[in-house]
């Protein structure tokens, strides 16, 4: 498949893309079922993910494909790709290289846990930084 020629496969049409041509994606660690991160994909990103078996997302801020780990080396090897019952969310079951998925140097982007009550609560970091981000992104 050559995704450069815009000849994308028909199976992509089953996905319910939003008005911007994007679909939300959850990356889950295949071995532990830990939820690692949330991101977005466009058609090209999903096709490249299937083709290469490595996670490729779409960066809304940079407006381009984001090959997970292209700067940090923390790539995600994709074991399985699933589509939810409404066909509007993609789940990637991945092997997270180095164990770090988050740009903060943590295993998961979901490292903040709410503790307390609605009137007296706050978000608390409950996962350690595994590697200082200044040493990840040089």
Swiss-Prot record:
Positions contributing to Zn(2+) binding? 85, 102, 109
Sorted alphabetically, the keyword list is:
Amino-acid biosynthesis, Cytoplasm, Histidine biosynthesis, Hydrolase, Magnesium, Metal-binding, Zinc
Which GO MF term does the entry hold, naming one?
magnesium ion binding
Report the EC number(s), separated by commas if there are several. Answer: 3.5.4.19
Write out the pathway annotation from the protein's UniProt entry.
Amino-acid biosynthesis; L-histidine biosynthesis; L-histidine from 5-phospho-alpha-D-ribose 1-diphosphate: step 3/9
Q: Where in the cell is it found?
A: Cytoplasm
Q: How is the cofactor bound?
A: Binds 1 Mg(2+) ion per subunit.
A single Gene Ontology CC annotation of this entry is: cytoplasm
Top-level EC class: hydrolase
- Where, in this chain's numbering, is Mg(2+) bound? 84, 86, 88
Q: Which reaction does it catalyse?
A: 1-(5-phospho-beta-D-ribosyl)-5'-AMP + H2O = 1-(5-phospho-beta-D-ribosyl)-5-[(5-phospho-beta-D-ribosylamino)methylideneamino]imidazole-4-carboxamide
Q: Which Pfam families match?
A: PRA-CH
**Matches recorded under Gene3D superfamilies:** Phosphoribosyl-AMP cyclohydrolase (3.10.20.810)
Query: What's the main place this protein lives?
Result: cytoplasm
Q: Which GO terms describe its biological process?
A: L-histidine biosynthetic process
Cofactors demanded by this protein? Mg(2+); Zn(2+)
- Please describe the quaternary structure of this protein: Homodimer.
Q: What does this protein do?
A: Catalyzes the hydrolysis of the adenine ring of phosphoribosyl-AMP.
Q: Which family does it belong to?
A: Belongs to the PRA-CH family.
| Cited PANTHER family | HISTIDINE BIOSYNTHESIS BIFUNCTIONAL PROTEIN, HISTIDINE BIOSYNTHESIS BIFUNCTIONAL PROTEIN HIS7
What is the official name of this protein in its record? Phosphoribosyl-AMP cyclohydrolase
Its taxonomic path starts at: Bacteria, Pseudomonadati, Pseudomonadota, Betaproteobacteria, Burkholderiales
């Amino acid at each position: 498949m050559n995704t450069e020629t815009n000849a994308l496969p028909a199976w992509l049409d089953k996905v319910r893309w939003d008005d911007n041509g994007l679909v939300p994606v959850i990356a889950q660690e295949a071995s532990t079922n830990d939820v690692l991160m949330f991101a977005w994909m466009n058609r090209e990103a999903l096709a490249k993910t299937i083709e290469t078996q490595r996670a490729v997302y779409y960066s809304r801020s940079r407006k381009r494909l984001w090959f997970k780990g292209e700067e940090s080396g923390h790539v995600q090897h994709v074991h399985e790709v699933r589509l939810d019952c409404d066909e509007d969310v993609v789940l990637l079951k991945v092997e997270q290289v180095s164990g770090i998925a988050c740009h903060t140097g943590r295993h998961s982007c979901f490292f903040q846990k709410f503790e307390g009550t609605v009137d007296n609560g706050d978000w608390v970091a409950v996962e350690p930084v595994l590697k200082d981000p200044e040493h990840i992104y040089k």
